[in-house]
Every structure is written in structure tokens, then in C-alpha cells.
Amino acid sequence: MEKYITLITNTITPLRKSPQRLNLRPTSQEDREAIARLLFSAYDESTFPTQENAQHYVETILNGTHGEFYPEASPILIDDNGRAVAVLLSLKNRLDHNGPENTPTLLELITTPSRRREGIAEELITYALDVMHTQHHGAASTHISETNAAALALYLTLGWQRWTPQDDTFLPA
């Protein structure tokens, strides 16, 4: 069974290197199919064997199966051809994890393989944290597979910290 690491951060984003350069917008229900196509293209067959599997997973997120979907803090980047390039799907409260109570969760961060390493993921995270901060959430969490070195490096570079249940009273200042 795959193991996950829980990371937390405060929602103040002092590490922003430059102004937002991408035309991001909140995810809407109309983005379901575009997100499913992106998800299917970004993962290997063991995660989503078919487009329908990816579509079902997206439906569970947007319909609140994992917790209340947080569309304002779920930015999406659509290219000039109307295709989803990247998306970050957030929840106001995640129902199926052991993270900090009442803390929004960055659930899925997906960038199309051909557009990775362009700083898009960092902008999506910063956008989501800015929204959360504006809406009076002091902290956010995410869960990263122990084997996903690239994602772990990204979050740690952005100042996220490892969290365990023993740290329950600690959230970054």
C-alpha cells in the first residue's frame, strides 16, 4: 500500500517570486470533462486505466465525496485551444484523511506532461493559498505520495512542513 506524507503551511504566501503571470480562473462544474482528460493524460494506466475511471474520480471530487469542494481555491489553466493545461483541486475540509482539523486541503495538483517545469504548479498553489487567506483560513494541508519526489520537493521549496498527528497543536505561523 502506498504511503503518504502530510504537509502543512500557513496561507500567507511570502515566497511568491513574481506577480501572477498566468490567466488562472476558479474551476467550475463545466470543467469536469477537461479535468478528467487532463487527469487521464497525467497519470499512468495503473492509476486510471480508462478515461471513464478518471471521469468518475473527478465526479467524486466535485460532488463532495472526499469533502466539500472548494471551487474558489481550485484554479485551472486553459490554453488557447480550450484544453486544460493544469488544475489544482482543493477541498474546504477533507473527510478521508488524518490531517489537521478544519484545514483546507490541496487534493489534486495536475499539470499536463508537456507543460511541466514551467512554474505552473507553483502559481496554482500560490493562487489557492491567496484565496484561502482572503477567506480567513490560516493554514492548508496536502498529502504527497512518499514516492513522488518532484511534488515533495516543490512543496518543501515553497515552505510547506511535514505534519503528523502528534503535531496537532502546531500549525505554521
Where are the language model's segments positioned?
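Acyl-donor-binding surface of acyltransferase catalytic domains
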Residues: 1-22, 169
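A short beta-loop-alpha structural element at the N-terminal edge
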Residues: 23-37, 48
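Conserved GNAT-fold acetyl-CoA-binding loop/helix
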Residues: 43-62
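A short helix-loop-beta-strand connector motif used in the catalytic cores of GNAT acetyltransferases and
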Residues: 63-76, 86, 105
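Conserved acetyl-CoA binding element of GNAT-fold acetyltransferases
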Residues: 91, 99-113
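Conserved acetyl-CoA-binding loop-helix of GNAT-fold acetyltransferases
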Residues: 108-111, 117-130, 134, 152-157
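Conserved beta-strand-loop-alpha-helix junction that forms the acyl-donor binding cleft
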Residues: 113, 141-152, 168-173
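Conserved GNAT acetyl-CoA-binding A-motif
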Residues: 132-143
